[in-house]
Amino acid sequence: MTALTLPEDIRQQEPSALLYTLVSAYLEHTAQTGDESLSCLSDDQHTLTAFCYLDSQVEEGGFVQLIASGYGEYIFRNPLADSLRRWKIKAVPKVLDKAKALYEQHGKTIETLADGGADIPSLRKQFPEFEEWDGAYYEAAEQDLPLLAEHIQSNWETFAHIGQA
């Protein structure tokens, strides 16, 4: 098991900084070890990583950007929502369920248009139905980030070490 190199004050950081600092350490570790598939990460660490990808993409450009950037399958076809529910996180998974239905309808089209060079603002105009869930996500994330940080703090060893015990 490998202890991550983390800032001394990491456990005192505000919730989003705590989450993003951990995921940054995971990605740095996997880059250094050549583990491009992130296979050394535990299920909980994968969940946290997926959440941070979700959060960064949706906060920047909504679900359309998440899909156009190629993260749709990673977020919607993996058990992220169910894993968050197991952590007692409720608001974000509800939004993910609604956005997933739109992804199933429009995901391939958005990905194809993005691969063809369409920019995010024009894609957002073409798929305005995602806007409602973008707004719902912003509210849900604000509510759930402290709960995520609390879960991480309560299970610190699970998140601060990589590899098998």
Swiss-Prot record:
Highest taxon in the source lineage: Bacteria
Record text on activity regulation: Activity can be modulated in vitro by crown ethers, which are small cyclic polyethers that can modify protein surface behavior dramatically by stabilizing either intra- or intermolecular interactions, thereby probably altering the protein's tertiary and quaternary structure.
Protein purpose: Acts as a DNA mimic. Interacts with DNA-binding proteins and prevents their binding to DNA by occupying the DNA binding sites on the proteins, acting as a competitive inhibitor. DMP19 is a bifunctional DNA mimic protein involved in controlling nucleoid formation as well as gene regulation. This bifunctionality depends on different oligomeric states. The monomeric form interacts with the DNA-binding protein HU, which prevents HU from binding to DNA and forming nucleoids.
Record-stated family: Belongs to the DMP19-like protein family.
Domain notes: The dimer exhibits a double-stranded DNA-like negative charge distribution on its surface, which facilitates interaction with DNA-binding proteins.
Oligomer and partners: Monomer. Homodimer. The monomeric form of DMP19 interacts with the DNA-binding protein HU homodimer with 1:1 stoichiometry. The dimeric form of DMP19 interacts with the Neisseria hypothetical transcription factor (NHTF) dimer.
The name this protein goes by in its record: DNA mimic protein DMP19
Organism the protein comes from: Neisseria meningitidis serogroup B (strain ATCC BAA-335 / MC58)
